[in-house]
Amino acid sequence: MKEMINLDSSSEPSIVTKQFSVEECLSKLKEQHCYVPMRTIGRLRLRKSSDQTEKKCWKEKLMKIRSELEELWEQSMMYEEQKELTQLGEMLDRLWDKHINSEGSKSETISDTAISGNDDTMEKRLEQFSDDTLQDTLETEKNLNSKTSESLKSPTLSYPFDLDSLDKRIFKLESKIGYADEPLSELLNKCMEKLEIVEQDPQFWQSRIESWKQLLAKDFLKHHERNLCSIEKQTTLKNSSLKELCTEEDIVIMLEICSSQLPFVEQYMPILPLLLERLKSLQNMHTDAAEAISSWQGSKDVMMTMQSELNEWKNTVERLDHSKFYTQSVEEMRRLSDTVTQLEKRVLKLQ
């Protein structure tokens, strides 16, 4: 069964007449009466409507304040700050409830005047439906209020809340700890996920932590021993080099001389940079001269070796000149020639 309402206007014939069923009228009224509490809205976007711009601006402001308070409550690490923020949230909830109740009463009066021209059955059904919807919304609101009050339960404070002091404290903490690139809510979520992983098997992670501690202790001991060995080697090398160069008495005498000359150093302060530059240039010159001397010394050594070889050759030649080898060889040649001639004569005689 559908009861139809004919809304035609005889005074304005240009307007198109429409027919609405009872269910459609009830659904429209339900949309007006069944408001959503502010706690359940969170950060959802509001529906756009050109009729209620002022009301929605007011709602949007309250919702922005509420969302900022929720973010601050999530980011705050102090219990006192959370208590103060929950008090502010309760105050905003009261303002929200008052505003919604006033809107509900206005909508009820408007709906009653709009439907007053209809029959009695329509009014009764609308009144029953509005009462039922109001009771349902009140029950849902009470349940949500109880849930939020339990989740954000905190004792009342004896002093008023000041946002400036909270901002100053947050600024001090950030100046001491440092500014994080990520928001605190994401960091807290990551920490919670890690804690959940650890809580799943605490014995396993405890054994791992103990093994890591042992490994770290061993690495620390090895590193410490290496540092000690290197320091001991450096100290021994320094002491040995100093002992080789000079004795302790010489070191004491040099220190006394340096300390006695310290007052005169101030007089030569403007000249010292020029002297240092001159010494650096002289150092380069000395290195070049040392290289030239070393190369000349090498060439001199080569010449000395060549001279010694020439002397040896001269000595051998002189020995050959003064030796009797030449005279002995000439005599032997004569003897050989004589023997050859004698042999030739004998051969001729035989012929």
Curated annotation (Swiss-Prot):
- The signal peptide stretch is none
Give UniProt keywords alphabetically. Answer: Chromosome partition, Cytoplasm, Meiosis
Location in the cell reads: Cytoplasm
Task: Give the source's domain of life in one word.
Answer: Eukaryota
Per the annotation, which location comes first and is thus the protein's main one? cytoplasm
Name any Gene Ontology BP term. Answer: chromosome segregation
Q: Which GO terms describe its cellular component?
A: cytoplasm; cytosol; dynactin complex
Tell me, in a sentence or two, what this protein's role is. Answer: Required for correct meiotic chromosome segregation.
Q: What is this protein called?
A: Meiotically up-regulated gene 1 protein
